[in-house]
């Protein structure tokens, strides 16, 4: 069956099997290691439990939040997200229709939980948040490269915390690659988030070739 699936990939592409599991699941980890899978990544779910209103910090000069307007802005947000995540592990250029179906065309979608930071007519950063299993969930937090290292990510994160706090949601979580190249884990720890769950990702290469994840 694996051979049949490989035939679906273009002949020049790298093919691999990738599985994730709890870091504490020693049985599954040993099975994968015995089958010559490589440990390639650690993934954290981080949480914070709010006991008081989070602090508020100003947004960088020239940056303002505007309400998310679905039809007018959804493609712009898609583009901003795709750009912001180009240097993240596992990134593959996205497809707008699939993105829209997964994120916006959902019955539970609440546009007031999407916080978009603008610099003039350019999206500088965003926080896409939602409710997930009784937790306020930061589904995606991103800052485009020209606006990094100015405190925008922290301002967006704390703004999201405050919006959840106002709605009575005191537990807030997110998922992050433990080796995130933009320093996201340091930011999350700075605002009081702690590791709640750690997963590991194993990979076994079936065929070498061109890797879509390494291309922009």
Residue positions per predicted region:
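Conserved hydrophobic beta-strand within the GNAT/NAT acetyltransferase core sheet
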Residues: 17-20, 138, 172-176
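A short, internal acetyl-CoA/4′-phosphopantetheine-binding micro-motif in the GNAT/acyltransferase core
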Residues: 21-22, 141-149, 178
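A short beta-loop-alpha structural element at the N-terminal edge
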Residues: 64-79, 90
